[in-house]
């Protein structure tokens, strides 16, 4: 009788069909069926990190505009003091040498203490941006500024002729909650997890021409 009750109980359960997906080492149980990966369409790069934004962010001394975490909402960039390799330390940073040389983001010495903690993929190619952490309802966006800081990921399509706004719109249509990228209403993206993320079949139209099957 106990076994019979157990079987009857199973029959009354509301079953929810899921797909078991392994993607770049990530295990997912998804409702949707995903046929390709973002890496088939594009590659993802991380933004630059200064390790001392209060010193490098300056409307007065800055020499480059950077897409930052607030750009998705405001459309505005942040003026930063960028130090290119081979250039001498900017005069405005000289008083802060002791602090900058002790930043822990990477090793610094007398030859590089004024450099940023992490660089970024510098390219004139069109790209889509997304904050690594955001509550924006449409997190993927385009901006003409080619520089981006560490709060932002840049998505470069393999096909340089692909309209990036089309790519952004397509990515904004994906059910990222089903793919495990939403926690407490906030999108959480990393370079690797986003690049390896499965994508639904309709995005196959964005594949480079040689990859379309």
Give the positions of each predicted feature.
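C-terminal substrate-recognition regions of SAM-dependent nucleic acid methyltransferases
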Residues: 1-129, 135, 165-213
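A short beta-sheet element
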Residues: 132-167
């Amino acid at each position: 009788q106990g076994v019979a009750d157990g079987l009857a109980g199973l029959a009354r359960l509301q079953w929810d069909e899921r797909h078991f997906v392994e993607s770049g080492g990530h295990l997912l149980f998804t409702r949707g069926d995903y046929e390709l990966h973002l890496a088939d369409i594009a590659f993802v790069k991380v933004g630059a990190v200064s390790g001392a934004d209060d010193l490098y962010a300056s409307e007065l001394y800055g020499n480059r505009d950077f897409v930052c975490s607030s750009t998705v909402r405001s459309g505005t960039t942040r003026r930063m003091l960028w130090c290119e390799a081979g250039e001498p330390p900017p005069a405005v940073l000289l008083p802060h040498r002791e602090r900058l040389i002790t930043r822990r983001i990477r090793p610094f010495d007398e030859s590089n203490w004024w450099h940023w903690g992490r660089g970024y993929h510098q390219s004139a190619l069109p790209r889509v941006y997304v904050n690594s952490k955001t509550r924006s309802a449409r997190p993927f966006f385009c901006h003409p500024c080619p520089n981006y800081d560490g709060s932002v990921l840049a998505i470069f399509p393999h096909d340089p002729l692909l309209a990036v706004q089309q790519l952004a719109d397509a990515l904004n249509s994906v059910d990222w909650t089903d793919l495990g990228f939403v926690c407490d209403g906030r999108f959480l993206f990393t370079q690797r997890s986003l690049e390896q993320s499965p994508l639904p079949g309709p995005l196959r139209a964005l594949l480079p021409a040689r990859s379309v099957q």
